[in-house]
Design a protein with these regions (language model features):
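Small-residue-biased structural context
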Residues: 1-131
Length: 131
């Protein structure tokens, strides 16, 4: 499986977890939100960090070299914002807070980011860079 296909597959797997988190946060169900965030902890921490590392090294770098750094710059910036928001969500959870707004923001950030990658960036890169 090529790198872009692997990354897209990882997006699909994470999307399922994010939908559960989003539903719990929208319902303002503290118990369900906590359970969903705990169930997704590895996916949103170590797995997400590994995913971002692969994405930046094996996808963004070649795309930047071929199509220009300006194309991927916003995606790098979003990675920083996603990690910071994620860290805030889990810090609040550790303080026994129900981070409804922060969890919704995290879901929105990741889902929008994934959609732009899967629908715009990766198809363009597949044609121009990863033939």
């Amino acid at each position: 499986m090529d790198t872009l296909a692997q990354l897209t597959q990882e997006h699909d797997a994470l999307r399922i977890l994010l939908e559960r988190i989003e539903a719990a946060a929208e319902a303002r169900d503290a118990v369900a939100l906590s359970a969903s965030l705990q169930a997704a902890r590895a996916a949103l921490t170590s797995d997400l960090d590994a995913h971002i590392s692969v994405e930046e090294a094996e996808a963004f770098s070649p795309i930047a070299e071929t199509l220009g750094a300006g194309l991927v710059a916003p995606f790098y910036e979003e990675h920083v914002e996603i990690r910071a928001t994620r860290d805030d969500v889990y810090a609040r959870l550790e303080r026994d807070e129900a981070p409804y707004a922060q969890a919704l923001r995290l879901c929105d950030l990741i889902l929008a980011h994934q959609q732009r990658e899967d629908m715009m960036l990766f198809p363009s890169a597949r044609e121009a860079v990863f033939r």
